[in-house]
C-alpha cells in the first residue's frame, strides 16, 4: 500500500510553519486550485500555523457586538438590511441610551467575554458631533465599569478628530471592513461611497495607534482570486484582526436570492488567509451557524482563532454560553488542553 503523499504545493507552503513569513501571492493563487483530500491537508497546515504563531498558548479571541444604532442608513450596501435603499424589514432606532448599552455589555462580561463592540449604522463620523461624543462617553464609561473589558467600535468612516478622540478614550480595536477586493467594491457592495474612504480611515486609525479590525464578506459574487486579492490588500494595510463573514441573504436586499458558497470554498479561503497572515487574529462571524451549520467547527481548524458570539447586527447568533463551551473543546486541538 502506498503511503499518503502530500501535494507539492502544500509542501512548498510548509515554509510558513518554519519561518512565520507569509506565503507569496503566487503560491496562494496556486493553493486555491487544490481539490479533494488536498484541501484537508491545507487546513491542517493552516491550523499548525495558527497554533504556532497566532495562538501559541491556545487562546482564542471571542467578541460580542451591540447594534447600538440601527437602520436608516444612507449608504446602498447591497447585502445590508439597514440600508434605506433596500426593502428589508428591520427595526430602526437612534443611539441607545447608556443603561441599555451597559446592560448588554454586562451580560456578556458576566459570561467571560472580554471584547465588546459598539456598532452604529450610517456612513460614519468625519466630524465630531454630539452623538459621537456620547459614544466616546460610553467607551470610557464601559472601561471604568467592567475591569479588563476591551471596548471596540464600528462607526463607519472617520475624520482625524474623531479618530483622535477614540484613541484618547482607550478603544481596543476599530472595525471597518473592506468587504471585497478594491476593483469590485462599487459593483458588488456599494457605489454611494468608495472603498478608498474606508482605506483612508484605516490609515488614520494606524496614525493614532488604534488596532484595526478589517475583513471581508464572502459569497456576494466575488471569485476565489478576488478573495486572495483582498487578503493581500489587508496584509499591506497590516490590520490586527481579520473578520470573515459569510453572506446570509436577507429578504428585501439585492442579494436576497444568492446561493450559498460551498463549504470547501469557505474553509479554503480561511486557510489561505491564515497562510498570508500567520500571526494575526482571524475570526469568523456571520454565516457560521446558518451557512456552515455542521461544519462551523472546521473553520477553527482551518486557521481561525476567533469568533463573534451572541448574535450579529440584524440576525441572531449562538448563545454565549454554548460558544464558551465550544472554546473549551477547541483547546484539545491546540496541544494546550
From Swiss-Prot:
Pathway info: Cofactor biosynthesis; biotin biosynthesis; biotin from 7,8-diaminononanoate: step 2/2
Keyword match Acetylation: no
Residue numbers binding [2Fe-2S] cluster: 152, 213, 283
Annotated binding of [4Fe-4S] cluster, by residue: 73, 77, 80
Keywords: 2Fe-2S, 4Fe-4S, Biotin biosynthesis, Iron, Iron-sulfur, Metal-binding, S-adenosyl-L-methionine, Transferase
E.C. code: 2.8.1.6
SMART domains for this protein: BATS, Elp3
HAMAP family linked: BioB (MF_01694)
Assembly with partners or alone: Homodimer.
Family note: Belongs to the radical SAM superfamily. Biotin synthase family.
Designated name of the protein: Biotin synthase
Organism, scientific name: Prosthecochloris aestuarii (strain DSM 271 / SK 413)
